[in-house]
Amino acid sequence: MVSIITFTKNVLVTLAFALLAQGLAIPEDIDKRAEKVVSLDFTVTRKPFNATAHGQHHQSQQQQQQQQQQPAQKRGTVQTSLINEGPSYAATITVGSNKQQQTVIVDTGSSDLWVVDSAAVCQVTYPGQSPTFCKQDGTYKPSSSTTSQNLGKAFSIRYEDGSSSQGTVYKDTIGLGGASITNQQFADVTTTSVDQGILGIGFTGDESSPTYDNVPVTLKKQGIINKNAYSLYLNSASASSGTIIFGGVDNAKYTGSLTALPITSSNELRVQLSTINIAGTTVSASTTPVLDSGTTLTYFSQTIADKLAAAVGAKWNSYYQLYTSSCNLAGNIVFNFAKGVTISVPLSEFVLQDGNSCYFGVSRDSATILGDNFLRRAYAVYDLDGNTISLAQVKYTTSSSISTL
């Protein structure tokens, strides 16, 4: 379900005068309501974790990378949500004059929007994968849209996990959250090894082609939101939906106060992490992870990951490319950032179960990433105009108090 919440100052003023004329009280929060925000609900997809598929996938991708000479064009998110590793967070958008529906992963770790063409070839990457796996969440047929514009430019993106997509650059009308943006540039992908389309909402400097206005920038430029900023609420691990609010923040969804941390990269949504407390141990983790909604697990360098795993008695399994662990991890893992910001996550969030075996939700990678198992316990406000990410401990509630950024 998607919704747009749009209140203008003129409407609020008119309503206030109307209430006064009738001798009625003006609600205290009338001037605090969101003026221009787009609220887009996530659909949470749960797929059973499969350690064998994880291991086969990563071995296959490592072989592909050794064979390919072309460097990855982007920061590598090991897109674990794309290989059956638990909940993934996607939203429904429409493309074209005839509103062709797509369900796309909402990804703060990349910047391009791409959708799957109706005639696309899905590249199978592990045994048992359906040959039509990439088309199951909607496709796009440019010729059926009267507003479609083929820009005649090739699109190619390869992630550092080896997954890739190729196609052609288009412009068309995009609908999301009840809002509509025109002449939006995106890619129509005709070959892909990724499960479904991706709505990348990071910095334009992280785009795979020469810089262009991606979706958040266009929302601002076309006057739908005031600022290139959005807030992220993934909700609990058992919830069926979460929400991203473009141009706004839901003040009911966190405890304490939001603290703004400087973004440390010009292209990626990174902040400074200091230490991690786990099982009575303090692990030095002076690094700058990407806060990435498009990645299910959390990734650190081998040095840091090994220390975290050792603290909970987890052992590295080279075949599965994961740490085997107890199925009953207790206590919390606490992430300590700059400015005294702390986010506490139950260790149960970091348990992946495959049958009778369990695995630790932290793994090794050259790219440092705090994925969904972290973000579910944080309320995050990404301000790309102000170059900050504000964090607070999440509060799970159906209440809402939205204000404009």
From Swiss-Prot:
Pfam families: Asp
Protein's recorded name: Secreted aspartic protease 8
Subcellular compartments: Secreted
Glycan attachment residues as annotated in the record: N50
Sequence ranges assigned to domain Peptidase A1 in this UniProt record: 89-392
Subunit structure: Monomer.
Residue positions of the active site: D107, D292
Residue spans crossing the bilayer: none
Cellular compartments per GO CC: extracellular region
Organism, scientific name: Candida albicans
GO molecular function, one term: aspartic-type endopeptidase activity
Alphabetic keyword roster: Aspartyl protease, Disulfide bond, Glycoprotein, Hydrolase, Protease, Secreted, Signal, Virulence, Zymogen
Biased composition (Low complexity): 58-70
Family from the record: Belongs to the peptidase A1 family.
Residues of the signal peptide: 1-25
The encoding gene: SAP8
Catalytic activity: Preferential cleavage at the carboxyl of hydrophobic amino acids, but fails to cleave 15-Leu-|-Tyr-16, 16-Tyr-|-Leu-17 and 24-Phe-|-Phe-25 of insulin B chain. Activates trypsinogen, and degrades keratin
Record-annotated disulphide pairs: C122-C134, C327-C358
PROSITE patterns membership: ASP_PROTEASE, PEPTIDASE_A1
